[in-house]
Design a protein with these regions (language model features):
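Conserved C-terminal helix/tail region of periplasmic/extracytoplasmic solute-binding proteins
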Residues: 163, 380-437
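C-terminal lobe and pocket-closing loops
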Residues: 274-288, 301-402, 435-436
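Short, low-complexity disordered leader/linker segments with a strong preference
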Residues: 1-43, 425-437
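Short, polar/charged alpha-helical segment
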Residues: 48-67, 399-400
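Glycine-centered hinge/linker elements that transmit conformational signals in sensory
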Residues: 180, 221-251, 297
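Short, well-ordered beta-strand elements
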Residues: 37-49, 66-72, 95-96, 144, ...
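Extracytoplasmic "Venus flytrap"/periplasmic binding protein-like
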Residues: 58-129, 164-171, 258-260, 264-269, ...
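Hinge/lid segment of periplasmic solute-binding proteins
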Residues: 102-152, 204-207, 289-295, 436-437
Length: 437
């Protein structure tokens, strides 16, 4: 089934999608203003991403028609999305917003971002994207943002610790388990990686890689599979790793997690391209330069991958100048000068063709023991097609986090995904949507 078919309108409206049907309202692309060829005016831009103030300044310096005023907001987990949603609802939100891919369908379903079709030069932007990156921002025939980064999920390892255990970088999940056992034997008390209860998007990525489809449609109904067969396989596998003490349950980015990386208690990270900066920050003082390497995810028998994280830029319903806002969104996501202006703010891997080398040049990767960007590129080429995010990610995310909180007191990952399945279905039904399981 083509992606556009997955979002066919439940109310029979040709331009509608199941997302927009969630609330019964939404932006009508037919009524969106057609931009002038050279839009002008003042716009506002909100983002929690580091360095975006520099990008806004570079855009302002590059032309004199549009003036961007930038405001830093907290990231989504720390209230950024609540602030954004409240402001848009009140009619005083920014012209341009930053929304991560799992959360975007929720903003679309609430009618809080507008389609960019007719506002952007699609042949020069959207049409140059891969199908996998288009799928992150397109619903039905409409484009509700332009993707900034396309974050391939990867593993990070201490190569010196693998060498001490006498193991190569695992290529399959079976090999990963065996590597963990050998690490235990060589270095008692060491863990090959950690399972992070607060990183639900990582669980989604691991399930995605295995072929899971947490959201889809069946006729005019949403089909929810947060505990589908592929997810159950992944849940059972990782529970086994926890039980065998191959991986440690710990909150990502916590003091405990950071100390475990610094002192060698945990020698691997389930992450993405953007993990590089955090790993370096937590391990550099321990003399680990040159020891950390990136690697493609172990697989289930054939090459497969997933995205983990990443953000889009969008024009909000609040915008009084959507043409100028869309012009700025194009600059943010397709112009090399935007990447240069942001500078060395992390190991970005970008969605638009040709921009990643610019980001790579700005980032100093000498801390790492292999060609990390080469690994990112390989992982990006294995993304499993067919994944889509649903319109109530908050329900799924909260339910999984809460259930994962019981993993150290007898709860299991399998129980957690079952709980999240029920919570997700209940949330969709509460929104007035038809749901099948």
């Amino acid at each position: 089934m083509k992606r556009r078919q997955l979002f066919a309108g439940v109310a029979g409206l040709a331009a509608s999608t199941l997302l927009l049907a969630a609330c019964g309202t939404g932006p009508n692309p037919a009524s969106a203003p057609t931009p002038t060829e050279d839009p002008s005016g003042s716009i506002t831009f909100w983002s929690s991403l580091a360095g975006m103030d520099k990008v806004a300044a570079a855009f302002n310096a590059s032309q004199d028609k549009i003036k961007v005023t930038f405001e830093t907001i907290p990231n989504g987990a720390n209230g950024g999305y609540a602030k954004l949603s409240t402001a848009i609802t009140a009619g005083n939100g920014p012209d341009v917003s930053t929304i991560e891919y799992p959360q975007l369908p929720q903003f679309v379903s609430n009618g809080q971002v507008v389609p960019l079709d007719g506002l952007i030069d699609k042949p020069a932007s959207v049409d140059k994207l891969t199908d996998e990156t288009k799928a992150l921002v397109q619903f039905g025939d409409n484009t509700f943002g332009l993707p900034y980064d396309a974050a391939p999920m990867v593993m990070w390892y201490r190569k010196d610790m693998l060498a001490k255990a006498g193991v190569d970088v695992p290529k399959t999940w079976d090999e990963f388990e065996e590597a963990g056992k050998k690490l235990q034997a060589a270095q008692p008390g060491a863990y090959l990686a950690s399972f992070n209860p607060n990183e639900v998007a990582a669980s989604a990525g691991l399930a995605w890689q295995a072929g899971a489809k947490w959201f889809g449609t069946e006729g005019d109904s949403w089909k929810v599979g947060v505990n589908d067969a592929a997810t159950q396989k992944v849940a059972t596998y990782w529970q086994k790793l926890i039980d065998e003490k191959i991986v440690k349950v710990s909150q990502a980015y916590s003091d405990e997690w950071s100390l475990d990386l610094a002192n060698g208690t945990v020698v691997g990270v389930v992450g993405a391209n953007w993990s590089a900066t955090g790993i370096q920050k937590r391990t550099e003082a321990s003399g680990q330069k040159g020891q950390w390497i990136a690697a493609e995810l172990p697989n289930w028998g054939s090459d497969a991958g997933a995205f983990y994280g990443g953000s889009s830029f969008n024009v909000t319903k609040s915008s009084k100048n959507p043409a100028a806002a869309a012009k700025f969104v194009e600059f943010l996501t397709t112009n090399p000068e935007a990447i240069k202006a942001r500078g060395n703010t992390g190991s970005a891997f970008l969605a638009f063709p040709g921009l990643t080398p610019v980001a790579q040049q700005a980032y100093d990767a000498s801390y790492f023991g292999n060609d990390i960007y080469g690994v990112f590129s390989k992982a990006y080429g294995t993304i499993t097609p067919g994944w889509q995010w649903g319109p109530n990610w908050d329900s799924t995310n909260t339910a999984l986090k809460d259930a994962y909180g019981k993993l150290t007191t007898g709860g299991t990952i399998r129980e957690a995904v079952d709980t999240a399945q029920h919570a997700t279905v209940a949330g969709l039904k509460q929104s007035g949507l038809s749901v099948t399981e």
